[in-house]
Amino acid sequence: MSGASSGTAIGAHLFGVSPEYRVLIGDGGAGPSKSLSEVSFSVWYRSRAARLVILCLVASFLVPCLTFLIAEAVMGQTVTTPLSLTLDHWSEVRARAHNQGVEVRKKKWITLCEAEWVMMNVGWPREGTFSLDNISQVEKKIFAPGPHGHPDQVPYITTWRSLATDPPSWVRPFLPPPKPPTPLPQPLSPQPSAPLTSSLYPVVPKPDPPKPPVLPPDPSSPLIDLLTEEPPPYPGGHGPPPSGPRTPAASPIASRLRERRENPAEESQALPLREGPNNRPQYWPFSASDLYNWKSHNPPFSQDPVALTNLIESILVTHQPTWDDCQQLLQALLTGEERQRVLLEARKQVPGEDGRPTQLPNVIDETFPLTRPNWDFATPAGREHLRLYRQLLLAGLRGAARRPTNLAQVKQVVQGKEETPAAFLERLKEAYRMYTPYDPEDPGQAASVILSFIYQSSPDIRNKLQRLEGLQGFTLSDLLKEAEKIYNKRETPEEREERLWQRQEERDKKRHKEMTKVLATVVAQNRDKDREENKLGDQRKIPLGKDQCAYCKEKGHWVRDCPKRPRKKPANSTLLNLED
């Protein structure tokens, strides 16, 4: 028994447990009985493996719990902003910018949104925004002419505007709500209601009776003075209308067309708004044929906005249309989306009291209204309103003609082989107007236009322009003069052909001279070779005849009998006598 107890004690000591644990494993010997808690504490205290196992169990339980709690806390505190939204979808933002021909970088994107645009003091928040008003304010700072502009930020603000105007699905929930339309001010006095047969065009005042001419008119002459003669009045009924069933009133355009067909002799040709007798303006609306010709003989606004803008500018200057005519002109020549862009850009240019563009809605609605105003072109105030309206409309057309910045399209404009420098410069400026928001006539953009003009010219002009001394001090007109000089000094096709022929002739002469030298060398070598062979041939033996001497070359004897051949003297032989 004592041996078993000692063995158990030794085993307990080896496994790091208390000797009292022998009671739990069935030691029948006498000894103190310990409780389970005391035994567990003893195992925890003495066994390192037990402590390690318990710590691992506790850690495996606490780590997931803490991770879950931290994740819940972080997710509960994260706020999605326009800036973070664009960073989460950065690949789509870069693709959108690439489609517009520009490149953006994430680091600069963050810097501009959080710092530089905020410091412009135009209301841009640090977290970014998709509000078109804030984007427009930042654009004004970026597109400012001269040294106050920021051309390097153009790709980033254009990409912001693209995300706001053509938002993808992940941007739409963060767009600001549209502003409610501004209510029109109520007139102080009630306006008289228009009759059912009234037209949208202003009422033509009744002209005064014409003064009798000094000279009697020639009835046989078909000519009239369009600048001084009052046009014939519109036909009207003379006397009370006939009694009978009343027909519905026709539209003004249909009435004018019907009257023109019925009474062609009494109808005058439609002319622009101009002053008639007694300085009273006369008014004729646009004809359908004019609108059709303008639309069919000019490219669409989306294809060539500059050409259509120039056309509308000439129409506004020569015809001096009213507000209704301007709407009719825009509706005939532009699409719905293009009209909205033009009107939006025009309302941005409404001047305030200080002459700068204003943001006051009442001033904008009063100066450039979207609904038909009560402007009478017969009064100076009405004509002044129409003049300012037409100027703003032209500004809106030029603003809407600016496409997203695409410098790649500008770089593709290169000078043709036979194109003059002046024509190339005009095409280059047109590309700047069409594909960038910059004005090539602005002195602040002269450096970029000069670089494009130099590096995109034809190779011969480019090489000579780059070698000019003091190139930094040249203006665009100076470079154009130098390019014209280089272009005019170009050789004609006949001169080029003659130069090539002379060069080919010189090349042939040089080749002939080289071939002559080679042939002379070969002939000299052959001559030396023949000379050596002849020399060796002289030294060879000539065959002898049958009766010819090999020594003296004479015939009649052989060499052994030749008398000219020296003969050897015979040696004196001494005979020995054997007897001696």
Curated annotation (Swiss-Prot):
User: Does Membrane show up as a keyword for this record?
Assistant: yes
Q: In which broad location class does this protein mainly occur, judging by the first location in its UniProt entry?
A: host cell
* Basic and acidic residues composition bias: residue spans: 491-508
**Which controlled-vocabulary keywords does the entry list?**
Glycoprotein, Host cell membrane, Host membrane, Membrane, Transmembrane, Transmembrane helix
**What is the recorded membrane topology of this protein?**
Single-pass membrane protein
- The Low complexity compositionally biased stretches are 194-203
UniProt modification remark = Glycosylated by host. Cleaved by host near the middle of the molecule, releasing the c-terminal half containing capsid and nucleoprotein domains op GAG.
Name of protein: Glyco-Gag protein
